[in-house]
Each structure stands twice: as C-alpha cells, then as structure tokens.
Amino acid sequence: MSNHVIIKGKNDRLVIALDPNIDFLDICDILKTKILEAKDFIGNSRMAIEFSGRALTNEEENKLIGIITDNSDIVVSYIFSKRAESEEENIDLNSLNPLIEEGKTHFFRGTLRSGSKIESDGNVVVLGDVNPSSMIRARGNVIVLGHLNGTVCAGLGGDDRAFIAAIYFNPIQITIGMKTITDIQDEILDSTRVDKKSKFKVASIKNQEIVVEELI
C-alpha cells in the first residue's frame, strides 16, 4: 500500500506520486489514510500540490484536492499535475509571442502578501498568489500563476503592447501603458476554493481600450 501513493515535500510544494496501475478509488482511500497520518507533521501550511506519476482528469484532480483539504489543515495555493489526454486544453500562446520582448524577467515564487510590492524593469512572473493591497509594477508583461487579487501595472512608460495574465483573474485595478481600469473585482478569490474550470485570462489593449479575454 505504501508504494501506491508516496507523499514528500519539495521546496514550496507537496509532491504526491500516484501509482498509474491501480484503481482510482483505491488511490483515494490510500491518499486519505496518508494525509491523516501526516496531518500533525504538515500542520497548518499554505503550499502548492504536485501530482505525479498518473494522468488525472479534472474530476479526479478535484476529488484528490478535496480529500487533502478535508483531512488536513493545508491551504492549496496552486496545483501542478499531468492532464489526462482527453482533458488537455489547447492553449495557443502564439498569439502572445509578438508581445514578449527579449529582456529581463523577474520570477517570484510564493504569495505576494498585502502591502508588498514587486517592481521590475522587465517582465514579472508570479508562481503563486497576489493578495489584495499588494502591487506589481513592470515595464514588461505580468503573468500570475495563481490568484490575482491585487493591483498590477504593466507596460510602464507607455508600452501598450504589454499584457497582464492570470489563472484566477480578479484584480482590484490594472494599468497597461497609459490605460487603467478599476471596479472589476466582484469578490476576493480564495485559493482554498480550487476551481479547475477557471480559464486563464489575459488583459491587453485593443482599439485603445483594455480588454480581458479568456485564453482557450
């Protein structure tokens, strides 16, 4: 049983290796047992979850995340996994390539907490969440691989070719070049409510206005 589900820590994430050759319901039972056994050791932690070894559908992934959150004090900030072939999304990044210039990219791993700020002369990529009252200012593009609840300024200096993108797109305010939009936040997105159906959204300037579109 111990070899069918293996849990180990890796930097900022919990890696869960799954046996691809046993029934998924057995995986669920074993994972629940192991999470309960490790609950006190893991404690109240905010971390990403990485599933490896087995391709998962959205439904299976959500089921496993539910088992983890229901049986531990883990707050899931992001999910890494291999998608089942039938569930793969064809995301066309070529449409963004003309907007990406060569230059410096600032990578930030973790949660940008309220009151914190990132400033960069190039692009910014956040591997985590951007909390309310936090700010990102970049001369290039800004990509958030998590929940965007803060304020983002891209294309500082008037570059209207820049873009802002996030998996969970809910900023307080965004500025691209010289254009700004506010009042676009309906609620604070909570990373404990994992919705794998959320679409990756991109804000860019079209016809002199900021437009937010789903990237599908």
UniProtKB/Swiss-Prot annotation:
InterPro entries per UniProt: CAP/MinC_C, MinC, MinC_C_sf, MinC_N_1, Septum_form_inhib_MinC_C
PANTHER family named in the record: SEPTUM SITE-DETERMINING PROTEIN MINC
Disulfide bonds: none
Span of the signal peptide: none
Chain's role: Cell division inhibitor that blocks the formation of polar Z ring septums. Rapidly oscillates between the poles of the cell to destabilize FtsZ filaments that have formed before they mature into polar Z rings. Prevents FtsZ polymerization.
Protein name per its UniProtKB record: Probable septum site-determining protein MinC
Entry annotated with the keyword Lipid metabolism: no
GO BP terms, alphabetized: cell morphogenesis; division septum assembly; regulation of cell septum assembly
The UniProt record lists the keyword Cell division: yes
Quaternary state and interactors: Interacts with MinD and FtsZ.
